[in-house]
């Protein structure tokens, strides 16, 4: 039987932090009823029982293993405190005093020593357990949890604890225990060296749990106010109210994905604890957006299950624990909608790993393992598994990231398409310019380097630098802000346009695009990156990267850098001749105070300048997968290949190998002559893309004509990518006129039949021969139709015509023998300027309109035609 002892100066009833006496019935019922709960219980017993039994025979066996305090054996402390914590939990569940005794004896020897301990200072950082930063996350939380679960046991005058100093038993010293929890709480909050970031959250439970174990109500409230409000504003520790307010407008923590998700999960744990102890704050109901935002993370994963990676982040990021926290909170607070959604999503996540089979371990950092039992809720077999919502276009606002995916395939893992571009300043940001990652054939192929163990040399001089990502460096300048303050690492990349817009539905199963701009004042340049993601079949597609870049000063040269996991990278001209590459000293040095990171490139070989088209092939020989890169002719460039350091967490074991790199150097500006690369992932060495030609609008390069052959079908895409939505591209030879930022004309020819697709991603109008597509109110549109014949010609047989096609003010309606037709006159932006009814030879006066290009649309009962004409007064 559990006895409750409450001091006269406090109102808390123990246990209270992770679980209460009232919670016990449901927890033990779960242990009896459900395999997942009974499994956790059995695992806890198997881990603790041998130690419990040994301790009963000889207490000094375990107690004598406590490392020195203060000292550096953090692992030894963690193992012992974890044993005590698990034993304390088992005492709570079973009322077996042997578990309580083991936990209490370990606790007492720690609290007696810590109450007297003076922290050790090394390199300006104070610590008790060997690491000022990690101990606040590992050891500090375990001590109050042990204390809470055995509080009534140790304060029962009938019980004693074993004291190694006297080699005998004594009464538990609650005074030293109280001194310890206060000391740890204050030490935790004072040790934070990076305010206004996730550090106070990661260390926060070390402070919160110790504060909530302070007996005296007045003192506890004073400490809690410092944690929650910090009214003095003197602590480096971020008040929890600041933390809650710091979530982004998308309701996610504004750092890299792995730090964001982890931080948000810890915040949920703290919210649940605070709400248990201080319900009057109404912290859950007032901050439901923190729960809502957790589902956004599912949008940040490639089809293989690897997370996108920007800044100091990782690929393998589990989402189960964060959904378990939502379910725990929602169940305790009786929030039906949140309960239902969390259960459905968890059911889906469990299905991916063969069911929910929890494994008890000693958590190496953040400690939450026991909560799977204490806060766990069963998910019935009748619950329907539901994948978290994912979208075709996703914007990560704080990181300046836009990602797009095309899963219009029967096998999204192998044939799904997905990429991201962007960059910004946030905690743990890298200076990247407008970086990019590309997915294909089950792997993240186009990669940034990632982050390892923060080795000072390679992390500072490469991993966080431009050359570790896929970007463009201007005039060798790769400056960045001060990492130590995370205030202005780089300027934020802004989204100019995308189709679909973030979180909206795509209008096409084949075409998506985004365009982003960076005003890089650190490196005195303006850059714009437009990526079109083009699907050509269920199993094929490509990315068209159009990267514009110009210096605000002298345009000496621009370097386009692209990393792709693999074994080799080779280059050939478009005619299949090998590109001559010779050893080069390029990239061996950096400009002083402008570290790009490219000095980490090795085995650099470069070409002479050439205007010929060049194709690169990245080969993943062990898995027979490839990335084909097509760079059209027309602009003089120098091409290089190199070897970069291994890419962290690269799939298919390529994290063990150096990373192949391709670079392109272009002298002069790269704005009117942007870099254009078509990337096609393929299984096998026969890509579907056969040729890529740049599209010209006067002297400007504005996209590419891409010809693919897929299953015997010849697909021709005119992918038009202009710098702004008000610009007009005219191609007389191909009978194309487009006003807009991004558009595609596609013809697919097979067996004498031509399919045509007209796509406006962002713009106002697109004409191909007689067909005109006018954008909708969202400035996009899609039109598809079939034409008999292998080629498309201007419709010269129709009796519906206007003339002349160049007029000084008047046009004539040619309607043949029709008695009456309907007509409408449109501007290039799709605005209807004039409409009505006409008969053959009706003259329409347009002299009131300004010079320019217009469309006339004519309709009778049997047909509809659109015809372009020019008004030139």
Feature names for model-found ranges:
Residues 282-364:
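C-terminal, helix-dominated tail/subdomain
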Residues 1-11:
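Bacterial Sec-dependent N-terminal signal peptides
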Residues 5, 788-873:
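C-terminal outer-membrane/trafficking sorting elements
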